[in-house]
Each structure stands twice: as C-alpha cells, then as structure tokens.
Amino acid sequence: LGQDPRALTQDTFNRDLYPTPGRSYEGETEDYGISAEINWDFGNVTLTSITGYREYANSQGSDTDYTTVDILYRAPTENALARDFETFTQELRLTGEAFDGKLDWLIGAYYANEELQVRDNLRFGTQYGNFVACRIAIAINPALVNPGASNCLGANVAALDGTLTGSPAFGAATPAILAGINNLASISDLGTVSEVYNQTSENFAFFTHNIFAITDTLDLTLGLRYTNETKDFDATFRNDNTVCPTNRNLLGGFLGVPTLAPLAGGIISLSCQGNSTSELDGVSLEDSREEEEFTGTAILSWKPTPDLLVYGSYSRGYKAGGFNLDR
C-alpha cells in the first residue's frame, strides 16, 4: 500500500523507501560506559573488585506505516520510541586455597542499580481517517466508494440514509452508523501525545563457589547464591484521540445486535486502534515487586584418565520478573 512498485524489485538490503513527504526517520543514540577491575593479593587470598557503569539513550522518529499514505507516524522528538537506561554494578570477590590446595574457595557479593525509561508518541497521520473510512465503505458496498470524499462516501451517502430508496440501509441505527463513519473519517493527527514508563531495579546478592579435591581424580563442586531484587514501576499517559470514546458510546449498544455488530465493531476498532483513546489522558500507574531466591549448583566429576572426564551435575537458576513497559 502506498509504495512505489519499483521498491518491490530491489535488493532486500539496498533499496529505496517511499515514505510520506515530510515524515522523518531522524533519530539519536548515545551509548557509553566505564568499568574497572582491581585485584589485591594477600598471600593465599585475593580480593577482586569489579565496578561498572553504563548509560544508553535512543530515540527514533519514523513514518511508521512505511508508505506514502500518512497513516501512522512518530515525530522525531525525545519521546519517539525512546529507550533510556542507566546501570551501576559493583562486585566484590574473595578467592583462595585451603587444606594444602585441596580446596579452592570463593565468596562474594554483588550489587546492581538500574533505571530504565521507555517513552513513545505514536500518532495517527493526517490521512488515517480517510483511509479507514474507505475500508468501512468498501465493506458496506464497493460501488459507493468515493475516495475523494473525506468519509469515502460523499454524495453516495444518499444510497444509505434513505434519500434515494426511502428505506435507510441500517434501519433506525442508520443515523448513528453514518455519524460513526464521519467521526472515524475525522481522525487526523490524533493519538499519543506521550507515554512515559519508568522502572527502577535494585539487586543485591551473596554467593560462594567451592571446589573440593576429594582425591587426585575426584572433585566435588558446590555453589550457592542468594539474590534479592526490588523493582518499582510507574507510568503516565497523554492522549488526545477523542474519537475513540465518542464512537464507543455512540455505537457500543449495537454490538449485541447480530446484523449490526460487525459494522459497529469495525468502526469502533478502527477508531481505537492500538488502544489509542483520550480516556488514557492523565492516567498514571504505579506498582512494585520484591523477590528473593536461593540458587546453586552441585557437580561431582571424576577423571579416571587424562583423556576422560565423567561427571554428574545439578543446578538451579533464577531470573527475576518485571513489568511490561508498554500497553
């Protein structure tokens, strides 16, 4: 839809795009970080410190429908499909030997703090209303389609409102159906003004990993880790698509009428596509979660010859949950 046919014959990774004039794919990305590892030797014991910090920010405007028809877009602002995060980590480890080298031991602690923000500003373009009104008009009767009219019907609406036939096409519901189509056709540059999602994560852990040389050929490895993680979430929404609640209130009563439900449902769905509605305007959400877990591993390995290793192992892993940073 809306693409120059020449684009279909070009190489997958080297081809021209034909976006809506005036829509931009301008974006900006910043990514940097620093890490440091320091080791101190104290005879048979080594202390290791690993510190890391990373910061990333990205936003990307787009002609989101990727066609010359202005259906969906993201303006190239700081809210355009933006991803920002800052992460700080610190790990401390002590390692050493005991019992004449029969035990290699390790104990440690870990801390991480991450702040993540996701933003978006996806909006309906200036031709969305006309485009989806034509979809409805085609579903009603392709012969009545007039793409030059804003509601894709124009004067042909007389064939539906009873002016020509004396019998309205949808009975007593006809005025509401036609009003819903007109409302749908009016969608132009509406939708998300901004969506902002924030998640802050704080994680700390204590761990140990030890290898016991039972004999010269038989080793037992035991590891244990305790992890505690807290995540705090909040989100705020700004949306100016008033057509969605208007058409839902206007046509929602017809969803229980079998002969009208498909048409009424189609108009409502296209009015609220992507859950875009002004009912979200000013809405804010908050939540939090805390988890703690023990994980570990146990491995028994036997090396009967220099070229053969036989082992059995058990391990239990864990990954903390989080929040979906979108709708």
Give the label of every model feature segment:
Residues 1-106, 112-117:
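Outer-membrane beta-barrel domain signature, strongest for Gram-negative TonB-dependent receptors
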Residues 33-35, 89-93, 194, 203-211, ...:
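Membrane-embedded beta-strand positions in outer-membrane beta-barrel channels/transporters
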Residues 17-18, 26-30, 82-86, 189, ...:
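Short sequence motifs at beta-strands and strand-loop junctions characteristic
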Residues 1-20, 63-79, 121-194, 232-288, ...:
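Solvent-exposed loop segments that connect transmembrane elements
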Residues 39-42, 86, 96-98, 208-213, ...:
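Residue-level signature of outer-membrane beta-barrel architecture
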Residues 49-51, 105-109, 222, 298, ...:
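Membrane-embedded beta-strand positions of outer-membrane beta-barrel proteins
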Residues 44-47, 102-103, 218-220, 307-310:
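Repeated loop/turn-to-beta-strand initiation elements of outer-membrane beta-barrel proteins
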Residues 42, 53-57, 111-115, 226-232, ...:
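Transmembrane beta-strands of outer-membrane beta-barrel pores
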